[in-house]
Amino acid sequence: MPTHQSLGGSTDEQLLQRMVASHRERFGEAYWAFFAARVAPRLPSPSVVIDLGCGPALLLQDLAQRHPAATLYGYDVTPAMIAHGRQLSYPGATPTLTVLDVSVQPLPHASGTVNLVSMASVLHVIDEPLPVLAEIRRVLAPGGIFLLNDWIRQPLQRYLAWRRDVMGERAPQDLRRGFRLFPVHSKYTTEDWQWLLGEAGFSIRDEVQLRDAHRIFVATVTGPG
């Protein structure tokens, strides 16, 4: 699959450091309030949880703090991300972290055994999302949740202003990276995501926009899983 590094002209280490630095902006109080209200009540205890495209595993660390009884798995295509996650401390059991490209490799889970699959700012990078969505659908247990958190289309001026003002990217090379990433991050509209989820056999139970140009969808399998 394409990577954020190849698309944005960054090294693995540069992307890792940006993800670590921006984690609280991406997964702050508003995110966890939404999670507690709209996602957590649907989960059994204990739960089996996958973060697909887990990056430096900070979201898994957050989940471990809030749901210490959960069995956590993280998958990412970049070895440096997995290595970072393995160095973190976690309440309860340490997540199983594995290098895996879900666009070409199946998830190592039996069908119908996972309660939550989270995918944050990753699916838009994958050229053919429907096979990946089918694999997520396969592993979800009855009543399981797919939590999709991804970019939605926005005007170029607003996108570049966000990179400058929120991400602090002000150098000439930052602007060049912004122009390279704009078509990737503005690939899908909200309606496109809604259609993709429906086409893949999911029903949207809830959705919210907590950050500019990002939308969260809480989806479950439609009909037999």
Q: Which residues does each predicted region cover?
A:
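A conserved beta-strand element that flanks and buttresses the S-adenosyl-L-methionine
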Residues: 118
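C-terminal alpha-helical "lid/dimerization" subdomain adjacent to the S-adenosyl-L-methionine
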Residues: 149-200, 205-208, 213
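Short conserved loop adjoining the S-adenosyl-L-methionine
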Residues: 106-111
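A short glycine-rich, Lys/Arg-flanked "PGG" loop and its adjoining helix->strand segment in the class I
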Residues: 130-142
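Short glycine-centered segments of the SAM/dcSAM-binding site in methyltransferase folds
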Residues: 48, 144-145
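Short catalytic micro-motifs in class I SAM-dependent methyltransferases
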Residues: 121-122
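Conserved class I S-adenosyl-L-methionine
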Residues: 1-45, 58-62
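Class I SAM-dependent methyltransferase SAM/SAH-binding core
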Residues: 50, 56-105
